[in-house]
UniProtKB/Swiss-Prot annotation:
UMP binds at residues 56, 138-145. InterPro entries: AceGlu_kinase-like_sf, Asp/Glu/Uridylate_kinase, Uridylate_kinase, Uridylate_kinase_bac. ATP binds at residues 15-18, 57, 61, 166, 172, 175. Pfam families: AA_kinase. One of its GO terms (biological process) is 'de novo' CTP biosynthetic process. Inhibited by UTP. GO terms for molecular function: ATP binding; UMP kinase activity. Its EC number is 2.7.4.22. GO terms for cellular component: cytoplasm. The lineage of its organism: Bacteria, Bacillati, Mycoplasmatota, Mycoplasmoidales, Mycoplasmoidaceae. Homohexamer. Belongs to the UMP kinase family. It comes from Mycoplasma genitalium (strain ATCC 33530 / DSM 19775 / NCTC 10195 / G37) (Mycoplasmoides genitalium). Pathway: Pyrimidine metabolism; CTP biosynthesis via de novo pathway; UDP from UMP (UMPK route): step 1/1. This is Uridylate kinase.
Amino acid sequence: MHKSNNKIRQRIIIKLSGAGLTKENSQPFSNDFFETIINQLKVLKESYQVGIVIGGGNIIRGNNCQEFNIAEYHGHQLGIIATVVNGYFLKAKLDAHNLKSALLSAISCPSLAVQILSQQTIDKAFEENDFVIFSGGTGNPYFSTDTALALRAVQTKAVAILIGKNGVDGVYTADPKKDKNATFLPTLNYDHAIKNDLKIMDITAFTMCKENNLKIIIFNINAENALLDALNKKGRFTIIENN
């Protein structure tokens, strides 16, 4: 059994969107981004058991299938597979830093990842590793990575969900890129977000988070020490919870 320290560490879940993993020069992965994130993960593992839900948008998005003239179902399936590719890349980077991780998948791909068959699969992965990477979404088409994020947060009994946005530092009353009068919201409750249709994540995922009393922290993933500052309540971020 893996033991990085003797104290009981709470679990957190980090969402890494596929769009944030890439470079503007059309390369699917940004090495600088991964190095920056991993340096922060090294610090986090001393205090937390870290779960990571990873998207696939740097490779393909399920809802963009029309431009390829393929059925939406196939587009979603390709999106699911893309998250496994991204998860494996992250695991390879963690291996390069001698950090112990497990890649779990909601779909069967035994040569790459351990399929999530039960709660015991998840608990065992956390017991034996510093980081658990969740790929394959929910395993079903038409469900977003947000839904997978909420599901894994509930399953892991996470104390917080950290959602790193690409170039956005939290939640606003409107899209700040389109509305100069948009107001930044440092704190927010679920009911207000739903009532005002703030579109933080899809409603299925958001409702699951609300019903399970999960705390969500939204921040700019590209900011310096973004993960560490968000957890330590430094810098600019939005906290969403029931109150």
